Amino acid sequence: MIIKNLLKIKIHPLFYLFAFLSSITGLFYEFVIFTIIIFVHEMGHVTAGLLFKINIKKILILPFGGLTIFEMPINIRLYKEFLIAVMGPLFQIIFWLFLYKINYCNSVFNYYNTFILLFNLLPIYPLDGSKIFNIVINKITSFKKSYFVTFYTSIITIILFIYVIIFKNYNLSLIIIVFFLIKELIKGYINFNFIFNKFLLERYKNDFHFSKRRVIKNINSMKRDYSHIIKEGNKYVTEKEILRKRFDNVSK
């Protein structure tokens, strides 16, 4: 199982370019340390995914981070998604404690480990901090509102981050990271209708058994981890009935 998932690791072409540049600029040791930390971090996500028997599509190693892509439903229970998101940072902390215990920590490792840990917890999509933030907001309000609260929070945070880069700590690597994050944000905004329809279609096609139920006015108010009764005038109908009308009309 482990070997099978290790074969899903894909190296981004830019990774090789950064490896070459770091070797000719005397920063190859730092690049290796950075990459090891990224690998450990992603293995945290992978481990959590395997515990929940979620299929891993691919593990992408970038020159400035990693990305584990799972084949999991949008309607996965929030606690499972939370554990998957938090296991990356947790593995980093455990790895640091292990190295500290055997007296193998140095200033380079401490610097990069702290940077990756704190940066990754920023509420910027698609970082873990954004996923954790989105899970918290999903506990409070609907899926649709949560998505846009997370999106606009990401924009505000990335603007503040750009300010820090420009006026406090100009760094080419950070600028490349910002461009990657902006690209992902734009993609997330463009894909919202697809994601929302997938959220609804999953609920129509599958029988999710949620212990909590609430009455809502329309599908825009649907929440994760809840089943719903929709009030239409003086009549109450199940979410399945509403979704059947929506998707049956589309297929005709």
Regions found by a protein language model. Name each.
Residues 1-252:
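Hydrophobic transmembrane alpha-helices and their immediate loop junctions
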